Amino acid sequence: MRLGSPGLLFLLFSSLRADTQEKEVRAMVGSDVELSCACPEGSRFDLNDVYVYWQTSESKTVVTYHIPQNSSLENVDSRYRNRALMSPAGMLRGDFSLRLFNVTPQDEQKFHCLVLSQSLGFQEVLSVEVTLHVAANFSVPVVSAPHSPSQDELTFTCTSINGYPRPNVYWINKTDNSLLDQALQNDTVFLNMRGLYDVVSVLRIARTPSVNIGCCIENVLLQQNLTVGSQTGNDIGERDKITENPVSTGEKNAATWSILAVLCLLVVVAVAIGWVCRDRCLQHSYAGAWAVSPETELTGHV
Protein backbone atom coordinates (compact mmCIF):
# COMPACT_ATOMS: atom_id res chain seq x y z
CA MET A 1 0.00 0.00 0.00
CA ARG A 2 1.38 3.43 -0.96
CA LEU A 3 2.50 5.64 1.89
CA GLY A 4 0.35 8.52 0.70
CA SER A 5 -2.82 6.51 0.22
CA PRO A 6 -5.94 7.15 2.34
CA GLY A 7 -6.04 3.47 3.23
CA LEU A 8 -2.76 3.62 5.13
CA LEU A 9 -3.89 6.71 6.98
CA PHE A 10 -7.12 4.97 7.97
CA LEU A 11 -5.15 2.06 9.45
CA LEU A 12 -2.94 4.41 11.42
CA PHE A 13 -5.96 6.31 12.60
CA SER A 14 -7.69 3.20 13.96
CA SER A 15 -4.66 2.29 16.06
CA LEU A 16 -3.93 5.74 17.51
CA ARG A 17 -6.66 6.83 19.89
CA ALA A 18 -4.79 7.53 23.14
CA ASP A 19 -4.51 10.94 24.82
CA THR A 20 -7.42 12.36 22.89
CA GLN A 21 -8.73 15.80 23.87
CA GLU A 22 -12.49 16.05 24.23
CA LYS A 23 -14.56 19.11 23.35
CA GLU A 24 -18.21 19.99 22.88
CA VAL A 25 -19.86 22.52 20.61
CA ARG A 26 -23.45 23.46 19.83
CA ALA A 27 -24.91 24.60 16.50
CA MET A 28 -28.32 25.56 15.18
CA VAL A 29 -29.83 23.72 12.24
CA GLY A 30 -28.92 25.50 8.99
CA SER A 31 -25.96 27.37 10.49
CA ASP A 32 -22.21 26.88 10.01
CA VAL A 33 -20.00 25.64 12.81
CA GLU A 34 -16.30 25.20 13.51
CA LEU A 35 -15.04 22.00 15.15
CA SER A 36 -11.83 23.01 16.85
CA CYS A 37 -8.65 20.98 16.41
CA ALA A 38 -5.57 23.16 16.90
CA CYS A 39 -2.05 22.99 18.26
CA PRO A 40 -0.73 25.64 20.66
CA GLU A 41 -0.37 29.12 19.22
CA GLY A 42 2.94 29.70 17.48
CA SER A 43 3.17 26.21 15.96
CA ARG A 44 4.30 25.85 12.35
CA PHE A 45 3.73 22.90 10.03
CA ASP A 46 4.77 21.79 6.57
CA LEU A 47 1.76 20.61 4.56
CA ASN A 48 4.01 18.09 2.81
CA ASP A 49 4.76 16.49 6.18
CA VAL A 50 1.42 16.32 8.01
CA TYR A 51 -1.48 13.94 7.54
CA VAL A 52 -4.84 15.19 8.82
CA TYR A 53 -7.93 13.07 9.10
CA TRP A 54 -11.50 13.83 10.23
CA GLN A 55 -14.11 11.12 10.69
CA THR A 56 -17.18 10.42 12.82
CA SER A 57 -16.27 8.46 15.94
CA GLU A 58 -19.00 5.82 15.93
CA SER A 59 -19.84 5.13 12.29
CA LYS A 60 -16.29 5.87 11.07
CA THR A 61 -17.71 7.99 8.28
CA VAL A 62 -15.00 9.89 6.40
CA VAL A 63 -15.65 13.63 6.74
CA THR A 64 -12.51 15.09 5.12
CA TYR A 65 -8.72 14.67 5.14
CA HIS A 66 -5.41 16.11 3.99
CA ILE A 67 -2.73 13.87 2.49
CA PRO A 68 0.49 15.35 1.04
CA GLN A 69 0.68 15.23 -2.74
CA ASN A 70 -2.88 13.92 -2.93
CA SER A 71 -5.67 16.40 -3.60
CA SER A 72 -8.33 13.78 -4.27
CA LEU A 73 -11.19 13.60 -1.77
CA GLU A 74 -12.88 10.60 -3.35
CA ASN A 75 -13.08 8.81 0.01
CA VAL A 76 -15.13 11.59 1.62
CA ASP A 77 -18.69 10.54 2.38
CA SER A 78 -21.24 12.17 0.05
CA ARG A 79 -23.05 13.72 3.03
CA TYR A 80 -19.99 15.82 3.82
CA ARG A 81 -18.60 16.50 0.37
CA ASN A 82 -18.43 20.28 -0.21
CA ARG A 83 -19.75 20.80 3.34
CA ALA A 84 -16.64 20.05 5.40
CA LEU A 85 -13.48 22.04 4.79
CA MET A 86 -10.11 22.75 6.41
CA SER A 87 -8.08 25.89 5.77
CA PRO A 88 -4.63 25.31 4.19
CA ALA A 89 -3.46 28.63 5.61
CA GLY A 90 -4.71 27.60 9.03
CA MET A 91 -2.99 24.21 8.85
CA LEU A 92 0.35 25.95 8.30
CA ARG A 93 -0.18 27.55 11.74
CA GLY A 94 -1.25 24.28 13.36
CA ASP A 95 -4.99 24.95 13.11
CA PHE A 96 -6.64 21.83 11.70
CA SER A 97 -10.17 22.83 12.66
CA LEU A 98 -13.06 21.64 10.54
CA ARG A 99 -15.57 24.11 9.11
CA LEU A 100 -18.94 22.39 8.68
CA PHE A 101 -21.55 24.22 6.61
CA ASN A 102 -25.36 24.02 6.71
CA VAL A 103 -25.66 21.90 9.84
CA THR A 104 -28.38 19.24 9.80
CA PRO A 105 -29.88 17.15 12.62
CA GLN A 106 -27.94 14.16 11.27
CA ASP A 107 -24.69 15.95 12.13
CA GLU A 108 -25.31 15.50 15.84
CA GLN A 109 -22.53 13.07 16.72
CA LYS A 110 -18.88 12.86 17.71
CA PHE A 111 -16.15 13.86 15.25
CA HIS A 112 -12.53 12.78 15.60
CA CYS A 113 -9.55 14.79 14.37
CA LEU A 114 -6.14 13.13 14.03
CA VAL A 115 -2.88 14.80 12.95
CA LEU A 116 0.25 12.74 12.16
CA SER A 117 3.79 13.78 11.22
CA GLN A 118 5.54 11.79 8.51
CA SER A 119 8.99 13.10 9.48
CA LEU A 120 8.43 11.78 13.01
CA GLY A 121 7.60 8.31 11.77
CA PHE A 122 3.86 9.02 11.63
CA GLN A 123 3.83 9.97 15.27
CA GLU A 124 0.58 11.41 16.55
CA VAL A 125 0.83 15.18 16.83
CA LEU A 126 -2.74 15.95 17.83
CA SER A 127 -5.92 14.00 18.57
CA VAL A 128 -9.22 15.73 19.36
CA GLU A 129 -12.76 14.40 19.68
CA VAL A 130 -15.50 17.02 19.27
CA THR A 131 -19.10 16.30 20.23
CA LEU A 132 -21.51 18.33 18.11
CA HIS A 133 -24.92 19.08 19.62
CA VAL A 134 -27.55 20.26 17.16
CA ALA A 135 -30.60 22.35 18.07
CA ALA A 136 -33.58 24.01 16.39
CA ASN A 137 -36.22 26.28 17.88
CA PHE A 138 -39.72 24.88 18.15
CA SER A 139 -42.56 27.00 16.82
CA VAL A 140 -44.73 28.83 19.33
CA PRO A 141 -47.28 26.25 20.57
CA VAL A 142 -50.81 26.50 19.26
CA VAL A 143 -53.48 25.46 21.75
CA SER A 144 -56.89 24.67 20.30
CA ALA A 145 -60.03 25.90 22.02
CA PRO A 146 -61.43 23.21 24.32
CA HIS A 147 -64.23 21.02 23.16
CA SER A 148 -66.43 18.61 25.06
CA PRO A 149 -66.58 15.06 23.74
CA SER A 150 -68.82 14.36 26.70
CA GLN A 151 -70.63 16.34 29.38
CA ASP A 152 -68.00 15.40 31.96
CA GLU A 153 -64.78 15.95 29.97
CA LEU A 154 -62.82 18.74 28.26
CA THR A 155 -60.16 18.14 25.60
CA PHE A 156 -57.30 20.52 24.70
CA THR A 157 -54.79 20.04 21.87
CA CYS A 158 -51.31 21.60 21.76
CA THR A 159 -49.16 21.59 18.59
CA SER A 160 -45.57 22.70 17.94
CA ILE A 161 -43.30 21.90 14.97
CA ASN A 162 -39.77 22.00 13.50
CA GLY A 163 -37.72 21.71 16.68
CA TYR A 164 -34.69 19.71 17.78
CA PRO A 165 -33.86 17.71 19.85
CA ARG A 166 -36.93 15.78 21.01
CA PRO A 167 -39.02 18.04 23.28
CA ASN A 168 -40.62 17.62 26.66
CA VAL A 169 -44.29 18.60 26.88
CA TYR A 170 -46.00 19.82 30.05
CA TRP A 171 -49.50 21.05 30.82
CA ILE A 172 -49.72 23.68 33.55
CA ASN A 173 -52.51 24.79 35.85
CA LYS A 174 -51.93 28.53 35.47
CA THR A 175 -54.01 29.33 38.51
CA ASP A 176 -51.20 28.12 40.78
CA ASN A 177 -48.51 27.25 38.15
CA SER A 178 -48.58 23.59 39.12
CA LEU A 179 -47.92 20.80 36.64
CA LEU A 180 -50.86 18.65 35.64
CA ASP A 181 -50.54 14.90 35.94
CA GLN A 182 -48.85 13.60 32.78
CA ALA A 183 -51.22 10.65 32.86
CA LEU A 184 -53.88 13.08 31.62
CA GLN A 185 -52.01 13.82 28.38
CA ASN A 186 -51.22 11.80 25.27
CA ASP A 187 -48.13 13.01 23.35
CA THR A 188 -47.31 12.14 19.75
CA VAL A 189 -43.75 13.10 18.73
CA PHE A 190 -42.38 12.30 15.28
CA LEU A 191 -39.64 13.31 12.83
CA ASN A 192 -40.81 15.27 9.80
CA MET A 193 -39.29 15.38 6.31
CA ARG A 194 -36.60 17.83 7.47
CA GLY A 195 -35.44 15.54 10.25
CA LEU A 196 -36.94 17.88 12.86
CA TYR A 197 -39.48 17.04 15.53
CA ASP A 198 -43.20 17.83 15.43
CA VAL A 199 -45.29 17.27 18.55
CA VAL A 200 -49.02 17.02 19.21
CA SER A 201 -50.22 16.73 22.80
CA VAL A 202 -53.84 16.02 23.75
CA LEU A 203 -54.99 16.80 27.30
CA ARG A 204 -58.20 15.37 28.75
CA ILE A 205 -59.47 16.75 32.04
CA ALA A 206 -62.70 16.72 34.01
CA ARG A 207 -65.11 19.47 33.06
CA THR A 208 -65.09 22.36 35.53
CA PRO A 209 -66.82 25.77 35.52
CA SER A 210 -63.55 27.63 34.95
CA VAL A 211 -60.28 26.36 33.49
CA ASN A 212 -57.00 28.27 33.05
CA ILE A 213 -54.23 26.06 31.70
CA GLY A 214 -51.06 26.38 29.63
CA CYS A 215 -49.09 24.14 27.28
CA CYS A 216 -45.30 24.21 27.67
CA ILE A 217 -42.82 22.93 25.05
CA GLU A 218 -39.36 22.50 26.59
CA ASN A 219 -36.14 22.39 24.54
CA VAL A 220 -33.59 21.12 27.05
CA LEU A 221 -30.53 21.83 24.89
CA LEU A 222 -31.51 25.46 24.33
CA GLN A 223 -32.84 25.78 27.91
CA GLN A 224 -35.98 27.17 26.33
CA ASN A 225 -39.60 26.92 27.46
CA LEU A 226 -42.41 28.06 25.17
CA THR A 227 -45.73 28.37 27.00
CA VAL A 228 -49.15 29.34 25.64
CA GLY A 229 -52.28 29.52 27.77
CA SER A 230 -55.92 28.68 27.17
CA GLN A 231 -58.64 30.01 29.45
CA THR A 232 -62.32 29.11 29.59
CA GLY A 233 -65.18 30.18 31.80
CA ASN A 234 -68.76 29.25 32.47
CA ASP A 235 -69.62 29.78 28.82
CA ILE A 236 -67.74 26.69 27.61
CA GLY A 237 -69.53 25.43 24.54
CA GLU A 238 -70.75 28.93 23.71
CA ARG A 239 -67.33 30.30 22.71
CA ASP A 240 -68.24 30.62 19.03
CA LYS A 241 -71.30 32.74 19.68
CA ILE A 242 -71.43 36.55 19.78
CA THR A 243 -73.43 38.03 22.64
CA GLU A 244 -75.62 41.03 21.77
CA ASN A 245 -77.83 43.38 23.82
CA PRO A 246 -81.14 41.66 24.64
CA VAL A 247 -83.45 43.59 22.28
CA SER A 248 -86.75 41.93 21.36
CA THR A 249 -87.64 41.13 17.75
CA GLY A 250 -90.64 43.49 17.86
CA GLU A 251 -88.47 46.38 18.98
CA LYS A 252 -85.96 45.67 16.22
CA ASN A 253 -88.74 45.63 13.57
CA ALA A 254 -90.27 48.87 14.86
CA ALA A 255 -86.93 50.61 14.74
CA THR A 256 -86.33 49.37 11.20
CA TRP A 257 -89.71 50.64 9.92
CA SER A 258 -89.15 54.01 11.60
CA ILE A 259 -85.85 54.45 9.84
CA LEU A 260 -87.37 53.51 6.47
CA ALA A 261 -90.27 55.97 6.97
CA VAL A 262 -87.88 58.82 7.73
CA LEU A 263 -85.81 58.01 4.66
CA CYS A 264 -88.92 57.95 2.42
CA LEU A 265 -90.08 61.31 3.83
CA LEU A 266 -86.69 62.86 3.13
CA VAL A 267 -86.82 61.60 -0.46
CA VAL A 268 -90.30 63.09 -1.02
CA VAL A 269 -89.27 66.46 0.42
CA ALA A 270 -86.15 66.53 -1.73
CA VAL A 271 -88.15 65.82 -4.90
CA ALA A 272 -90.72 68.54 -4.05
CA ILE A 273 -88.03 71.11 -3.41
CA GLY A 274 -86.43 70.20 -6.72
CA TRP A 275 -89.63 70.81 -8.68
CA VAL A 276 -90.29 74.16 -6.97
CA CYS A 277 -86.80 75.39 -7.73
CA ARG A 278 -87.13 74.29 -11.35
CA ASP A 279 -90.41 76.22 -11.89
CA ARG A 280 -88.97 79.39 -10.42
CA CYS A 281 -85.93 79.25 -12.61
CA LEU A 282 -88.07 78.90 -15.76
CA GLN A 283 -90.24 81.90 -14.84
CA HIS A 284 -87.29 84.23 -14.31
CA SER A 285 -85.52 83.28 -17.52
CA TYR A 286 -88.50 83.36 -19.99
CA ALA A 287 -89.23 86.87 -21.50
CA GLY A 288 -91.82 85.97 -24.15
CA ALA A 289 -91.72 86.11 -27.91
CA TRP A 290 -90.83 89.81 -27.98
CA ALA A 291 -87.62 89.12 -26.25
CA VAL A 292 -86.43 86.64 -28.80
CA SER A 293 -87.76 88.32 -31.98
CA PRO A 294 -86.74 91.89 -32.89
CA GLU A 295 -89.66 94.32 -32.91
CA THR A 296 -90.87 95.03 -36.49
CA GLU A 297 -90.84 98.70 -37.39
CA LEU A 298 -93.89 99.78 -39.50
CA THR A 299 -93.10 102.36 -42.11
CA GLY A 300 -96.03 104.07 -43.88
CA HIS A 301 -96.01 104.79 -47.60
CA VAL A 302 -96.41 108.40 -48.66
UniProtKB/Swiss-Prot annotation:
It is a single-pass type I membrane protein. Gene3D superfamilies: Immunoglobulins (2.60.40.10). It is found in: Cell membrane. The keyword DNA repair does not apply. Expressed on peripheral blood B-cells and monocytes, as well as on monocyte-derived dendritic cells (at protein level). Residues 19-256 are extracellular. SUPFAM superfamilies: Immunoglobulin (SSF48726). Changing N219K: In IMD119; uncertain significance; loss of expression at the cell membrane; retained within the endoplasmic reticulum/Golgi apparatus; loss of T-cell costimulation; in endothelial cells, may also affect neutrophil transmigration capacity. Residues 278-302 are cytoplasmic. Induction: Constitutive expression is up-regulated by treatment with TNF in peripheral blood B-cells and monocytes, while it is decreased in dendritic cells. In monocytes, up-regulated by CCL3/macrophage inflammatory protein 1-alpha and IFNG. One of its GO terms (biological process) is regulation of cytokine production. Keywords: Adaptive immunity, B-cell activation, Cell membrane, Disulfide bond, Glycoprotein, Immunity, Immunoglobulin domain, Membrane, Signal, Transmembrane, Transmembrane helix. The chain crosses the membrane at residues 257-277. Residues 19-129 form the Ig-like V-type domain. Residues 1-18 form the signal peptide. GO terms for cellular component: external side of plasma membrane; extracellular exosome; intracellular membrane-bounded organelle; membrane; plasma membrane. Disulfide bonds join C37-C113, C158-C216. It comes from the Eukaryota. Glycans are attached at N70, N137, N173, N186, N225. Its main location: membrane. It is linked to Immunodeficiency 119: An autosomal recessive immunologic disorder characterized by childhood-onset of recurrent respiratory tract infections, susceptibility to chronic DNA-based viral infections, hypogammaglobulinemia, and panlymphopenia. Interacts with CTLA4 (in vitro). Ligand for the T-cell-specific cell surface receptor ICOS. Acts as a costimulatory signal for T-cell proliferation and cytokine secretion. Also induces B-cell proliferation and differentiation into plasma cells. Could play an important role in mediating local tissue responses to inflammatory conditions, as well as in modulating the secondary immune response by co-stimulating memory T-cell function. In endothelial cells, required for proper neutrophil transmigration in response to chemoattractants, such as CXCL8/IL8 or N-formyl-methionyl peptides (fMLP). Belongs to the immunoglobulin superfamily. BTN/MOG family. This is ICOS ligand. The gene is ICOSLG.
